[in-house]
Regions:
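Bacterial N-terminal signal peptides that target proteins for export
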Residues: 1-7
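Beta-propeller folds
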Residues: 20-423, 428-429, 437-441, 445-446
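Hydrophobic h-region of N-terminal signal peptides that target proteins for export
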Residues: 7-19
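Serine-hydrolase catalytic core recognition
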Residues: 199, 223, 280, 285, ...
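Alpha-helical structural elements
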Residues: 8, 26, 185, 235-237, ...
């Protein structure tokens, strides 16, 4: 009996001791997602600004939620409902509302092309009468997009632009030049998708009377082949057009198609340019703005194109040059008075500027030796612009709002680290996604003035798991380079670090453009090596 009690006591001691010890991180822990922090994703704000929708892949439904409570309030539609009402069985993996939110464009059987681009079979579901129409191309289509009035859908099929009239199929239209490995209309080539970070190459005008689109001629671009290792025993070979440095790029032109007259206009730019990294309609139905770059990417021009009777009028609206290169962004916003907001690094730092319709500066909205890192938008009701900036430290991000004249600036977040905002339509609410180097993603709902309303996601399970491991915090520091410029860096030392000993060092550096790796934010993988 005494022996048995001794064994029990020893066993309890070992168990308690094991519970008190923290685990060491293994490679398996890192890459199987032990420290993964979940975040809300796929939220789409509805027109009313107080509800959002989420695609529920497990249930095959599009669900409606309240921002204020986080509770589900309705199911917009489900695959089961579509089958019951139309007799057609579909499993959708993407969706898009029309402007009035009474029709849905549903993507099915989606397959990837490159990093961002894909093909799908598309259906249009009418929420009012429960009718279902399929885009009538024989194969999968790209980039289907409902017109502003939702009576037409435009898409790319076999490298050409097509319009399907949902009321009268006899009025379907095709335009642009398309041929595999040579001509593309409405989509973009590999260079634009990868280097300019967009893959949709056409846009409806605000009232749906015109479509502006890209036309590519890649017939002279050299091909590149690459072995792709998939599920098979042997790799498949992927062959595509790829211009290496100094080789020929695609010849690109911008066109405007008049949907009512079924007439195509090529935009004639009066200067020689290499790239058109962005096009965007203004608030006017017949005004398009095209951005152009030279091959060195140090000279940018915004061109205003106006559709007139019998043709197009093109004039230079804004011009900017840089001694090195100019970054491309999606921060161009047109206001109702035809003025526009633009971000530029022309004073040495990226800031917000307000220009009139002639491209003349009204005022610089933000100033200082720091960067505006994101522009969320302009709320015309309150007169505030919302943006993210690295004002306090390049390692961190904070959320601000400021009036159009540059006055009334407010910092909206309280916690120090990495903050990002996701605003509702109309800027009534926003979700703040916060983290730091030692704090997993923590998401909260706020009013537009910064007042916190509720916690959405605290990643408590991840925090509990981290507490069981022997972890060291990141230490941030600065290292001078050859000319004395301080470079930000971080280091993670063992918990029992002894400065008198020598240790092996694992260096991690990525020097690509537009990439920052020294950040005070949570990284579930690289911070746990």
């Amino acid at each position: 009996m005494a022996y048995r009690n001794f064994i029990i006591i020893i066993g309890l001691f070992i168990g308690l001791n094991a519970q008190g010890q923290k685990r060491e991180v293994t490679v398996q822990d890192v890459w199987r997602g032990t420290f993964y922090a979940r975040s809300t994703s796929g939220l789409r704000s509805m027109n009313d600004g107080i509800h959002f929708t989420v695609l529920n892949g497990r249930e095959g439904s599009i669900d409606k939620y309240s921002y204020a409570t986080g509770e589900k309030v309705a199911t917009i539609v489900s695959a089961e409902e579509i089958k019951e009402k139309t007799g057609t069985e579909i499993s959708f993996d993407s969706y898009q509302f029309n402007a009035t939110e009474d029709k849905l464009l549903l993507g099915t059987e989606t397959e990837s092309i490159y990093r961002h681009s894909s093909r799908s079979f598309y259906y249009i579901y009418d929420l009012k009468d429960a009718s279902l129409n399929r885009i009538n191309a024989e194969g999968k289509q790209q980039l289907a997009d409902l017109s502003p009035k939702a009576n037409k859908v435009a898409y790319v099929y076999e490298n050409r632009m097509h319009i399907q009239d949902l009321d009268d199929p006899s009025k379907n239209q095709s335009f642009g030049l398309g041929k595999e490995d040579e001509l593309i209309a409405g989509a973009v080539d590999w260079v634009y998708e990868e280097e300019f970070s967009f893959h949709k190459g056409f846009y409806w005008s605000p009232e749906g009377d015109y479509i502006a689109y890209y036309q590519f001629d890649e017939s002279e671009v050299p091909t590149f082949s690459m072995d792709v290792f998939g599920e098979g025993l042997y790799p498949a070979q992927d062959v595509f057009k790829y211009p290496k440095a100094g080789e020929v790029n695609s010849k690109v032109s911008i066109h405007i198609y008049d949907v009512n007259k079924q007439k195509d206009y090529k935009v004639e730019i009066p200067e020689t340019v290499e790239y058109f990294p962005r096009i965007k309609w203004t608030t006017e139905n017949d005004e398009l703005v095209i951005s152009s770059l030279n091959r060195h990417q140090d000279h940018l021009i915004l061109w205003e194109v106006e559709v007139e009777k019998g043709g197009l009028e093109v004039e230079k609206m804004y011009e900017e040059k840089a001694p090195s290169y100019l970054d491309i962004n999606d921060n161009l916003r047109f206001l109702e008075d035809e003025s526009f907001i633009w971000t530029s690094e022309k004073d040495g730092f990226n800031h917000l500027y307000h220009f009139n319709e002639e491209g003349e500066l009204i005022n610089q909205i933000t100033k200082g030796n720091w960067e505006v890192t994101k522009f969320y938008g302009y709320d015309k009701k309150s007169g505030y612009l919302y943006y993210q900036a690295a004002e306090d430290s390049p390692l961190r991000r904070d959320i601000y709002r400021v009036k159009l004249d540059g006055k009334g600036k407010q910092k909206l977040n309280k916690q120090s680290g990495w903050n990002d905002a996701f605003f509702s339509s109309g800027f009534q609410f926003y979700i703040n996604r916060y983290s730091s180097s030692s704090t997993p993603t923590y998401e909260t709902l706020h009013r537009s003035d910064g007042k916190e309303l509720r916690v959405i996601n605290d990643n408590a399970a991840t925090v509990d798991r981290m507490a069981k491991y022997n972890l060291s915090d990141k230490e941030f520091m600065q290292i001078p380079n050859a000319d004395g410029t301080p470079l930000n860096a971080w280091m993670i030392k063992p918990q029992d670090f002894d400065k008198s000993k020598a240790y092996p060092v694992l260096m991690f550096v990525y020097g690509g453009p537009g990439s920052q790796t020294v950040e005070d934010r949570y990284d579930a993988f690289n911070s746990f090596w």
